[in-house]
C-alpha cells in the first residue's frame, strides 16, 4: 500500500524519468513510449540498453540532471519512499561543456533540492560502464571517492556483461 513507508535501493535515473520530464526537457510534442520500452521478445541486454538512448539525451545539461533527480524523487515520494539510492552513469552526461565533477555535483544538488521539497533522503550510486575505456572508468571511481559521504554512497559497474565480462575490470575493482 502507498501508505507504507518504503526504501528504494535500485533506481536507475535514466530508466525512471517521467514521460512529462522527457517531453518537456527534450521539447517533444509527443513521445512514443515504445522508443523507451524494451519489447517483450528482447533478445539481449545490449538490445535492452538501447531503450536508454533517449532518456540519456535528456541528461546533457546541469539543470536537466538536477531536475531529473527531482523528477525521480517526486515519483518516489508519491509512493511514500523515505530513502532511496539512485544509480546513474555520469560519464554518459560528460560533453564539451560539462565535466564529470559538474555532472555529479548537479545530481547531488538535485538530491538536496528533492529532500527540501519532498523529504526523501537520497544518495547516488555512480556507475562505471562496461563499454567505456579504463581511463573513463577510473575517473568515475575517483569521482565516487571524492563525493563519497557527500551525496554518493557507492560505485557500480553497469552495461553489457556478455560483451565485457567481469575479468576485464579487475584493476578497476582493486582501485575501488
Regions found by a protein language model. Name each.
Residues 1-176:
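Metal-cofactor-binding active-site regions of metalloenzymes
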Amino acid at each position: 500500500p502507498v501508505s507504507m513507508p518504503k526504501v528504494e535501493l535500485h533506481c536507475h535515473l535514466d530508466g525512471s524519468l517521467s514521460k512529462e520530464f522527457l517531453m518537456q526537457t527534450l521539447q517533444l510534442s509527443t513521445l512514443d513510449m515504445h522508443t523507451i520500452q524494451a519489447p517483450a521478445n528482447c533478445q539481449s541486454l545490449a538490445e535492452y540498453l538501447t531503450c536508454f538512448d533517449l532518456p540519456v539525451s535528456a541528461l546533457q545539461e546541469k539543470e536537466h540532471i538536477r531536475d531529473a533527480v527531482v523528477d525521480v524523487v517526486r515519483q518516489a515520494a508519491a509512493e511514500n519512499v523515505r530513502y532511496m539510492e539512485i544509480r546513474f552513469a555520469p560519464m554518459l552526461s560528460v560533453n564539451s561543456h560539462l565535466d564529470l565533477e559538474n555532472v555529479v555535483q548537479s545530481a547531488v544538488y538535485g538530491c538536496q533540492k528533492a529532500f527540501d521539497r519532498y523529504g526523501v533522503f537520497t544518495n547516488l550510486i555512480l556507475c562505471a560502464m562496461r563499454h567505456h575505456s579504463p581511463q573513463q572508468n577510473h575517473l568515475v571511481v575517483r569521482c565516487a571517492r571524492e563525493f563519497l559521504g557527500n551525496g554518493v554512497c557507492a560505485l557500480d559497474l553497469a552495461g553489457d556483461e556478455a560483451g565485457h565480462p567481469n575479468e576485464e575490470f579487475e584493476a578497476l575493482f582493486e582501485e575501488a
